[in-house]
Amino acid sequence: MEAGPVSGAVVGRFAPSPSGRLHLGNLACSLLAWLSAKSQGGRIVLRIEDLDAERCPRIYADLLEQDLAWLGLVWDEGGSTGGPHGPYYQSECADIYTGQYKKLEAQGLVYPCFCSRAQLHAASAPHTSDGNVIYPGTCRDLTAAQIAEKRKKKAPAYRVRVPDEEITFLDGCMGPHTENLLRDCGDFYLRRADGVFAYQLAVVVDDARMGVTEVVRGSDLLSSTTRQLYLYRLLGLQAPTFAHCPLLLAPDGRRLSKRDGDQSLENLREKYTAQEIVGKLAYAYGLQPEPAPCTPESLIPGFSWAKVPKQDVCLPEGLF
């Protein structure tokens, strides 16, 4: 197993991307992350994942803090609260990421990639479970002369080489999960052509330096975990445990997104109290038998991952 418990106190985290207002799916995952940590006597760190600062105005980060606090999902450090493990905004961490990126370069594992997204999709390459194209290795073995010629026309992104190796981990919600790095993931991005670091590297570096011992997030990120465990190993960092919660779907089966304004907390706050929203989400995820109003604190004693469904959760018609 690549992931194991970290000794000492449990540290969970909220890691939202502030590209819009929070919706019910975000809130459900945040509630589960908070309950998992608090039921073990742990702490919560709030990290703002605004790697692409242009898409993530600071106003949305401020609003999501207000929304989480209103619901009673209070964090112990991070965000505007600060703490000993800052910066807590990824847009302020480029120098930190650069240091770790250079460690991977020094191992001879990083190479430039000149492929466009359109080219990859046109190649009909297979996709990972999170919808990304499995990279076919087009630029993996370019010669120095070929790289120099391609640079004249286009700035490259950068990928990390992966071996033909299976990685298995025990997910706290979904159970054992195995993927082959080469066949199921492929060489993946570390840095975009514009210099912005990729999600996979940033979250590994941040979770490690913030002392996070438990990562709770949506099941759409399940296939990211093997890539991240690979990076933890290469960088000599301690990996946390993982629990991937089922996604929350609209009554018609659609996946909720920030474009679903009717399911955004901005609109829901006009119709329901914080306790009503928490109670309805707890009911949808099997944490209480009825959608009765409740506080997050009241759910701590009875929380167990065994109660949480393994399949995506479809909101009952009329619940919200």
Where are these regions (language model features)?
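Sparse recognition of residues in long alpha-helices and their boundaries
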Residues: E49, S80, H244, L268-R269
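Short, mixed-charge aromatic SLiMs
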Residues: D52-D62, A250-R254, P301-P309
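Active-site cores that bind ATP or allylic diphosphates and position pyrophosphate for catalysis
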Residues: A118-S257, S264-L268, E317-F320
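Non-catalytic terminal extensions that flank enzyme cores
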Residues: M1-R21, S39, I44, L71, ...
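Alpha-helix initiation and N-capping motif
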Residues: A61, A94, R117-L120, N132, ...
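Noncatalytic linker/hinge segments flanking ATPase motor cores
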Residues: H23, G86-S91, K152-P156, Q200-V205, ...
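N-terminal Rossmann-like or analogous alpha/beta NTP/dinucleotide-binding catalytic cores
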Residues: E2-S124, T128, S219-D220, S224-L237, ...
